[in-house]
Amino acid sequence: MLVLGLTGGIGSGKSIVAEMFRTLGAKVVSADDLARMIVQPGSPTLARIARRFGAEVLCEGGALNRAWLAKKIFSDPQARLDLDRITHPAIAELARRRFAALAQASATLVVYDAPLLFEAGADTQVDAVVVVSVAEEVQLQRLMLRDGLDEQAARSRMDSQMPLDEKLARADYVIDNNGSLEQTRDQVVALMARLVPGMKGPDPHASGSAG
């Protein structure tokens, strides 16, 4: 089984690329999904977050107040570091279990869709890394449109991540997502053929869904 790490800057279209891999037959594990799982009400990770950030980080019913926490960490670098120290090990352990289960099920290719793959040190959990590349201005406009942010807030979120140039320098493969969806899909198809020749999956021209 080959585990392929998939990452890129926020607003790069990485989720669309992940869905393209899925349509080709890859098993996709989403770090964002794992991150949501580890902070369910009553979980040890959520308890640690509450101890660090106080009662304001919880909604009335005991769930994580994501809006409050996002505002906090994007304006306070130390808060982000503290949150990462709490959540990254828990996400890594859950990912390890998922990979083990997929290996047991004889999966051929697993794509680990992880926005903070390098920042979290999760590149050590994968066999190779694909970085989705997009021009900064395109990334900025997509992020503003997707999340309803003004330019300053969008740039703040972009700046909170590792610079794209650094990610590209550490990549094994690059998907250029500056063009059309069809051009991006063609790159994914070519990479799949290179990594797992002969792998049979659903129609590679099936529509990918944005995320």
Swiss-Prot record:
Name used for this protein in its record: Dephospho-CoA kinase
Q: What is the documented function of this protein? A: Catalyzes the phosphorylation of the 3'-hydroxyl group of dephosphocoenzyme A to form coenzyme A.
Q: Which UniProt keywords apply?
A: ATP-binding, Coenzyme A biosynthesis, Cytoplasm, Kinase, Nucleotide-binding, Transferase
Annotated source species? Syntrophotalea carbinolica (strain DSM 2380 / NBRC 103641 / GraBd1) (Pelobacter carbinolicus)
One GO molecular function term? ATP binding
Record's keyword annotation contains Kinase = yes
What is the name of the gene encoding this protein? coaE
UniProt record similarity statement: Belongs to the CoaE family.
The annotated pathway is: Cofactor biosynthesis; coenzyme A biosynthesis; CoA from (R)-pantothenate: step 5/5
Which EC numbers does the record give?
2.7.1.24
Q: Which reaction does it catalyse?
A: 3'-dephospho-CoA + ATP = ADP + CoA + H(+)
CC terms in the record's Gene Ontology section:
cytoplasm
